[in-house]
Amino acid sequence: AEFGRTPKINTNQGRDHWPFVYSLALAGGGIQGGAVYGKSDKSAAYPTENPRDPADMAATIYHLLGIQSDTRIYDNIQRPHSLVIGSPIEELLA
């Protein structure tokens, strides 16, 4: 995964981090081949179709690994934390 980059070049002739649009490539392991999910506006600044949170991508990967959505992990003082926060993106599954 690549953190998104600003649609416009900055004053230093580079691009800064941009959390609104980014790309990710997945292959095998239960991912539908050739799938493209989501769409951005013409300047690649904001999503226009199927916006999702990175937690949904993590949930998709956990699902493919067989990790249950109600899995809890515990920190060093035994406080429970949900491992899976998002929801799997069903359209990416084979």
Regions inferred by a protein language model and the residue ranges of each:
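Ligand-binding pockets and gating/stacking loops
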Residues: 1-94
